[in-house]
Regions:
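Soluble, non-membrane globular domain cores that form compact, hydrophobic packing
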Residues: 1-112
Length: 112
């Protein structure tokens, strides 16, 4: 089924984290190729913007969106789409995304 109500965004692994006293959902979805991951990450970003989200400043190639008083973060790394769903603030969301990116690199799976 489609994750977070986003058509075509499926086969998504989600996990709950407790970060800075808040419960946050993070996700990873492996795609066929880096190009497919980029397209999917852009579709996720566009979904939140279409439904009233506001883009915030973030690191290069990382979408940070404020929507309904929560923060969404989405990016692609190789064949992976990585994101954080409904974080309480930008800093917490970006810190969790960075943990996931680092973990993928540690295990030798950079998504390529």
């Amino acid at each position: 089924s489609d994750a977070f109500g986003i058509t075509g965004f499926d086969q998504v692994f989600t996990a709950q984290y407790r970060q800075n006293g808040a419960d946050i959902a993070a996700y990873v979805a492996r795609q066929e190729s880096a190009a497919a991951a980029q397209t999917t990450a852009e579709a996720v970003r566009d979904f939140y913007l279409e439904y009233g989200g506001t883009s915030l400043d973030g690191p290069e190639a990382v979408a940070v969106i404020d929507i309904l008083d929560t923060i969404e973060v989405v990016l692609h790394q190789g064949r992976y789409v990585i994101g954080v769903h409904e974080a309480p603030d930008r800093e917490t969301a970006l810190a969790l995304v960075e943990r996931i990116r680092n973990r993928l690199q540690e295990i030798g799976d950079d998504g390529s």
